């Protein structure tokens, strides 16, 4: 009541709307203009009266009254004196909440440097003055004097003088001949006297002259800061403070605790230090104290102000009474507990409850069970309102009483209130948007929330004690959004990959699988049924079993909706499932006439969703769930010990392997193989044995057996559970019935002795001990993994949060080329899977018939995909978010289908956040480790090529010879074998390694799976193209070649060793030369001599004087990969790719097409040049470390983008050399590979959205007529804007190359400083923004959440759109008025726009 009366007298001022927020450095005048008075005393409140002291930190005269409308001395009380200032105590009579708004200030007796501009690297003050930070600190903290005005003396400007040097200089030159100052005053003078325009001009001219890169960078940094100051209107001397602002007292409260003690904010202590020291300094100056004392006091003042702004940034941390560091102003903003992340982005919610969840199988998909007690509490305000409306109560107090007594009418009203009022259920951790969904509450007894079993997958919930939170959407708009967008029935598909997420699991799958099994010789086999009634009757009378082969009539409808029926060979169980299928011509009985494994059930639901729409799907899912549960119950599948079958051959397999291991031990003891080789072989042998046992076991379990009457025996229960996808994996079955196999040590190495027993036999003590390692490491890993995965998600969300669908179509002609991903002859991702739901960039035509499949700019749907794959189209150009040309966000056509809805994406969809969630959510399923697998197990290198399609061979860049054995050998380094289908369309194209044996030639026909090339994966050969006699050059025993004999075989081999390590060998160039019959060096086809340089470690395959013919091998270099290499896998690999880090030994990529030439070598680097093939291109030179295996020969032709040195390529190189498209396909494929290993499906477009955000910056290569400097990193959008205005004025535009930034860097460089500051390095971001006077236009989601507005996505996006239209309209009217056409013509215009928003656009 009181509040309402108050509102009559001071009506609520509507919150001002604003479009942007600007941050800059506060000038002393600005600080004084905020202030309501100076704080002169460090006192806070009087210990007897508890009233604030006058002029103290809580002074009521400055900050306002403590009680509403009451001055401090009590002379004026109540509203009627509003606005009067009491003459006794000087307090204005007003609301006490002004104590949260009014600021004060402290006048400093000596200027003080602001620590952010001093210490936040790079130091702004130091860069601006072009001095080192150390020197500036020396001056500021009173260690050295600085010469500001040398006069005619021999001193230099900005020279530092120690105390003694200063005294000597004064004696020598006299005090008035030069000026040297100390402390912040000195820096203030220097900053104030700077002429920024002149400095900027000098820097620009100096940059034009300088040649050194380092100098250029330094000048650029300084110029940037100078320009920032000029553009933002900040003055450099404002970085030195003469006035310190004091924040309002209610934001740093002093609270009395019981027992006469006080709890206080740390800021009060920090302010008190500043005031004390400041007052003492004033007094000392008045007393004319000696200079040294005053200097010490000034230094202490500087330190206390530093501590107030950023405690611990410089010097010791200032601690409070309890020895813990005091929280300074910076600490209030920083980190997870700071203002940004704790309070602005992490608000708590009212009207919420949480409880344990239990399963609710009788609920419908859109319902959840809400305990009555909980509902009563959550919906209280609604209940009070209804009680009042129905006349049960006249006041809130009465209503409260009724509810507390739980009167029967209250329950009736609760039912009314809850009807169709959705509530939100949330399960932490909310890793993706399906972690919060809306349901209609059904009141239940008890205290547990009931959850529908089908939504468990989305929430990742189970019923082993999980808890969930309930939230009530209050406003009508919120209820509407909950119902339309968040209802569980609207979230049938997974936003990450578009597959159904409402899929039966566990028991339901088992029940359906059991129902759909077909067995032989069951009772009733061969019967025929005309309708379901007959079938149910026969089942009841046991004339037929669920699994018998029968013929049944399935009734459905055709395209016109007329009933049709067809007879199928099926089982009664499958007929029962078919009964539930919606009647639709596109959902045939075949969808369920098969074994219903989890995969098939998912496909079935997908088919139903695509053809019958959402409503039918939801009903179908509910019925399928009921069916699954009831049949799981009836089947009563369980397993006993005997269901775990141990294969009989296990003993033999283990025995054979043990013998093999013994043999290896013997070889090692005889010194034939090294320790490492033995280890690898042993591990490999046991690995194979484990696999073999597992295979035998699976074969036993799967086997179909019959009983004496010839009826098929029931299937093995464990196999059923695993095969149906209900529970358990083949791996777990192997541990139960096969052998557990190899275990890892905590270090990640594999223990040589495996665990031979399985769980059925039981483990020996040793085996048990060995297996504890792995179990413990698994638990430790899980904890680390969760944290890492969460951090990755946070970085992804931060980088992509401002990526929103803002326009329908950007009309770009750029896009990506999609092809199928083939790995080792297996198609991992077909072209159809990759292009489904994307927009075609060009028309897609059938290459044979020429008929149009998809028009350019249209979305590729399921039928189109089938047509494209049938037509054998190999590559399709599609639009992608990566190449979208909209300035902010992306356009709908480039993005394509909204995966969670199966329709084109809506305007205002926050696709960035969805992408981040889709990539981050499966993060916890990825592994954490770097694999150190021993042994041949990891020689993943392929050693052959197989045809993945049938067709005709065509060889690109054909360069082959027949060697002396008559086998074709590839001599070219960029040969490719293509397979064409009967219509001449290329189905696949594979590069062939140099030296491969080729079994096909142009025009040959190949069958699928036929091997057409193979090579040795462990060595790379060096072959001759000419015939002749072998001669060695510089091959000197003991210096460049070492001979060794293999003891087991007695064969000697000669291997090249590093000849440069000995003084005698420095000038040798070991090579093999081929001479013709006249004794001259033979000539190669491409014009060089037949001289083959040998690399270190090459093994010679020929003897001097030996005759060789074309294609014969002269020497072999062992390949690195034959050794086991560590593969970074899982989460660390994904993070490495998104952070765009350079790999340790990264590949070197050729930048141009051309010929390899060797230059003069350096001490431990080889010089390799590429002579360009085209004219007018500069040759490129690379330095390659000598120890690295290098396989190219002098004169080899190499194409742009080929690897000169093998390894993982650095993404930056791919971008620079091959461009954005190649980079995108590299990153997408590498990231997908990690997820694919874990069986996680993520749509490519999500990764593309993130990569788009990583490519927002451009490095200027040609500044044109702009103000940019070459080497500047600018925003892509900003560059486009600048160029548009340059072109409009007829000037030369600036050009830039795209730059790839890692996600952390990209987040910190977003145009929005609010978003960047709330991410990481808060002080640094804010310092930078303040110096540049940045403006935040509030375009992303995060900034808007922080300032407390609707986000510009979804419903908020529409509001933004409407506001934009309104502003445009206002501007139009103002323009009219300005032109002087008067208001008359503008008024009708206004009316038009109000009726037709499109006109306003």
Curated annotation (Swiss-Prot):
Protein name stated in the entry: DNA-directed RNA polymerase subunit beta'
GO biological process: DNA-templated transcription
Cofactor binding notes: Binds 1 Mg(2+) ion per subunit.
Gene3D superfamilies assigned: 1.10.132.30, 1.10.150.390, 1.10.1790.20, 1.10.40.90, 2.40.40.20, 2.40.50.100, RNA polymerase II, clamp domain (4.10.860.120), RNA polymerase Rpb1, domain 3 (1.10.274.100)
Region listing for Disordered, in residue ranges: 1377-1401
One Gene Ontology CC term in the entry: DNA-directed RNA polymerase complex
Keywords: DNA-directed RNA polymerase, Magnesium, Metal-binding, Nucleotidyltransferase, Transcription, Transferase, Zinc
Free-text function comment from the UniProt entry: DNA-dependent RNA polymerase catalyzes the transcription of DNA into RNA using the four ribonucleoside triphosphates as substrates.
Key word Transcription present: yes
Transmembrane segments: none
Single annotated GO MF: zinc ion binding
Domain of life, source organism: Bacteria
Family annotation (InterPro entries): DNA-dir_RpoC_beta_prime, DNA-dir_RpoC_beta_prime_bact, RNA_pol_asu, RNA_pol_N, RNA_pol_Rpb1_1, RNA_pol_Rpb1_3, RNA_pol_Rpb1_3_sf, RNA_pol_Rpb1_4
Keyword Kinase: no
Quaternary structure note: The RNAP catalytic core consists of 2 alpha, 1 beta, 1 beta' and 1 omega subunit. When a sigma factor is associated with the core the holoenzyme is formed, which can initiate transcription.
EC number: 2.7.7.6
